[in-house]
């Protein structure tokens, strides 16, 4: 939780896989 940016990047990674 010390790196919120990592959370956003993970969401984008998952979203990209689902959006594919």
Curated annotation (Swiss-Prot):
Transferase listed as a keyword: no
GO molecular function, one term: DNA binding
Keywords per UniProt: Activator, Conjugation, Cytoplasm, DNA-binding, Plasmid, Transcription, Transcription regulation
Principal location listed in the UniProt entry: cytoplasm
Subcellular location(s) per record: Cytoplasm
Disulfide bonds: none
Superkingdom as given in the UniProt entry: Bacteria
Quaternary organization: Part of the relaxosome, a complex composed of plasmid encoded TraI, TraM, TraY and host-encoded IHF bound to the F plasmid origin of transfer (oriT). Interacts with TraM, probably through its C-terminus.
Entry's family note: Belongs to the TraY family.
The protein's role, per its UniProt record: Conjugative DNA transfer (CDT) is the unidirectional transfer of ssDNA plasmid from a donor to a recipient cell. It is the central mechanism by which antibiotic resistance and virulence factors are propagated in bacterial populations. Part of the relaxosome, which facilitates a site- and strand-specific cut in the origin of transfer by TraI, at the nic site. Relaxosome formation requires binding of IHF and TraY to the oriT region, which then facilitates binding of TraI. Also positively regulates tra gene expression.
Protein's recorded name: Relaxosome protein TraY
Lineage of the species this protein comes from: Bacteria, Pseudomonadati, Pseudomonadota, Gammaproteobacteria, Enterobacterales
